[in-house]
Design a protein with these regions (language model features):
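Nucleotidyltransferase catalytic core that binds NTPs
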Residues: 1-105
Length: 105
């Protein structure tokens, strides 16, 4: 199975994110959204606009999203530890990290 992973804060979730999720899903058999916490967003931009649990509920209810997990990038924006977590969840599957957007902000 090919698992596509997209990570981010998605705060607030908007139509561009939804189009992005759909495009990412087309590259695999399963789409996992790795959602950053409120604390991570506060560190990145000073506050979270939409609480984690609300963002998670909205994203979980998109028909093309298979799973939403909590996810933390480090202080430098690296998501290596988070991707290692996902690989440990799916040790025998191909993982595709399909990120774009504001990774350098």
């Amino acid at each position: 199975m090919r698992i596509v992973v997209v990570s981010g804060g998605f705060d607030p979730i908007h139509s561009g994110h939804i189009a992005y999720f759909k495009a990412a899903r087309s590259h695999g058999d399963k789409l996992v959204i790795a959602l950053n916490s409120d604390a991570w967003l506060e560190n990145k931009k000073g506050k979270a606009f939409m609480p984690f649990h609300e963002r998670k509920i909205i994203i979980e209810n998109l028909s093309f999203v298979d799973e939403v997990i909590d996810f933390e990038d480090d202080d430098h924006g690296s998501c290596i530890k988070g991707l290692e977590k996902i690989k440990s969840m799916y040790p025998n599957e191909e993982i595709i990290f399909a990120n774009g957007g504001d990774r350098n902000k």
